[in-house]
Amino acid sequence: MKTTILVVILGLTLLFALSAATELKDEERDCKGFQVKCKKDSECCSSYVCGRQWKWCVYPSPFGR
């Protein structure tokens, strides 16, 4: 019984550590994704532009700027 609880706690700790490492890797991206605050187009990923009104990375307008 005690070893089972210990194994469960160890497993949960390992799962937490792996998920935290994955989350840190996502934050290290060079560009910003959809609806993330930006100041200029070069901060957004290649398929997005920095919106003029709210300064978020959004899809480019089909009607031009």
Swiss-Prot record:
Keyword Phosphoprotein among record annotations: no
Keywords of this entry: Disulfide bond, Ion channel impairing toxin, Knottin, Secreted, Signal, Toxin
InterPro entries (UniProt xref): Huwentoxin-1 (IPR011696), Huwentoxin_CS1 (IPR013140)
Signal peptide coordinates: 1-21
PROSITE patterns per UniProt: HWTX_1
Gene Ontology cellular component terms for the protein in this record: extracellular region
Family: Belongs to the neurotoxin 10 (Hwtx-1) family. 32 (Jztx-16) subfamily.
Known role: Probable ion channel inhibitor.
Listed name of the protein: U11-theraphotoxin-Cg1b
